[in-house]
Design a protein with these regions (language model features):
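Paired acidic/hydrophobic, glycine-rich loop segments that form the ligand-binding mouth/hinge
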Residues: 147-152, 168-170
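Periplasmic solute-binding protein
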Residues: 17-55, 75-100, 187-195, 267-275
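Hinge/lid segment of periplasmic solute-binding proteins
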Residues: 1-40, 169-172, 241
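Short helix-initiation/N-cap motifs at beta->coil->alpha
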Residues: 57-58, 129-142
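Glycine-centered hinge/linker elements that transmit conformational signals in sensory
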Residues: 99-133
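Extracytoplasmic/periplasmic substrate-recognition and gating elements
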Residues: 161-224
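C-terminal capping/gating helix-and-loop segments adjacent to ligand/active sites or protein-protein/ligand interfaces
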Residues: 187, 224-230, 234-235, 241-302
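Hydrophobic residues within well-ordered alpha-helices
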Residues: 60, 84, 139-144, 148
């Protein structure tokens, strides 16, 4: 149990809204935002891609295919959200805090679930696409097989080692679905500091947490550890814009959603994505496959 932040109004005003939302429950702020870099984006090798190329996944796959290389992501994972998040279809956590609400199998919108499914089949069957575990992308960058990959700040040193001066990072690209360009989405995450409600010195602990997460210390944390600040003033620093990976996180966050999903989401996405990758639907129609995905996402894990 955490202590509500006593100077919540002040802390909220100093940090980006999304980081404050992440630390808020039932209208009360329970954490001091500290970083805003826990997201994912696109790394790319500038020797192969221009800044215009990386705006389009179709173009990136075309470039990779022509070069005999790959654009990589861990497709059979929660990253699947990237293709659904900005289509008008919805995924959310129910009020019980355990189960999910999801309409990814909708048949009535401008973009239907089966439209996304068809786009995913086209993307994953492209010779320039590679699905692999996130932990393997760095090695494939270094081997030369992968010239672009979706990952996070944890891979920044690997990307720099692999591509040197040609290392680049940017927001996720758009992909083609139902005849239109759809900006890929992402889950966003934030680190924060909280105070134990059972602390014998709660007041002093709150003061310490407030100080450790203030503007100056977030700047120091960026300088010494390359961690992206949640503090508005610290994030506006010109030095931030010089670090491609941190700037990519910030740019992608405009198209992201706070990661709040029930546990059933993860296994359902993996199963669906594995089916897409294998091409073996077990005789299910496209709509039936989408229905199975949504049934899995919305299933209760409570025994």
């Amino acid at each position: 149990m955490l202590v509500p932040v006593p100077n919540a109004e002040e802390v909220s005003a100093e940090n980006i809204k999304e980081s404050v939302d992440a630390a808020t429950l039932n209208g009360k702020l329970y954490g001091y935002p500290m970083t805003a870099d826990n997201g994912y984006f696109m790394y790319y090798n500038k020797d192969y891609f221009t800044e215009e190329d990386v705006k389009s996944l179709d173009k990136m796959l075309s470039v990779a295919q022509a070069a005999g290389k790959k654009v990589a992501m861990e497709f059979n994972s929660g990253y699947l959200y990237s293709f659904f998040g900005n289509t008008g279809l919805k995924l959310s956590l129910n009020e019980d805090g355990v189960t999910n609400a999801c309409n990814w199998n909708d048949t009535s919108g401008d973009i239907r679930g089966v439209d996304i499914e068809e786009a995913l089949k086209r993307i994953t069957s492209n010779a320039g696409f590679l699905s692999c575990p996130n932990g393997e992308i760095a090695d494939k960058m270094k081997s030369g097989e992968v010239i672009a990959g979706i990952s996070g700040v944890w891979d920044v040193m690997n990307a720099k080692e692999a591509w040197g001066a040609d290392y680049g990072a940017c927001k996720l690209p758009a992909y083609t679905c139902a005849g239109r360009e759809v900006q890929m989405a992402s889950f966003t995450g934030y680190k924060m500091m909280g105070v134990n409600a059972y602390s014998k010195n709660k007041d002093w602990a709150c003061k310490l947490a407030d100080w450790m997460t203030n503007e100056e210390n977030q700047k120091i944390r960026f300088t010494e550890r390359n961690q992206g600040p949640s503090n508005i003033n610290a994030a506006a620093s010109p030095d931030i814009k010089k670090v491609a990976a941190i700037q990519a996180v910030i740019d992608q966050s405009k198209y992201g959603t706070l990661q709040r999903v029930g546990n059933s989401y993860w296994d359902a996405c993996k199963s669906f994505a594995d089916t897409i990758l294998s091409g073996n639907t077990g005789g299910l129609s496209e709509q039936e496959l989408m229905d199975v995905l949504v049934d899995g996402i919305t299933a209760s894990t409570v025994k």
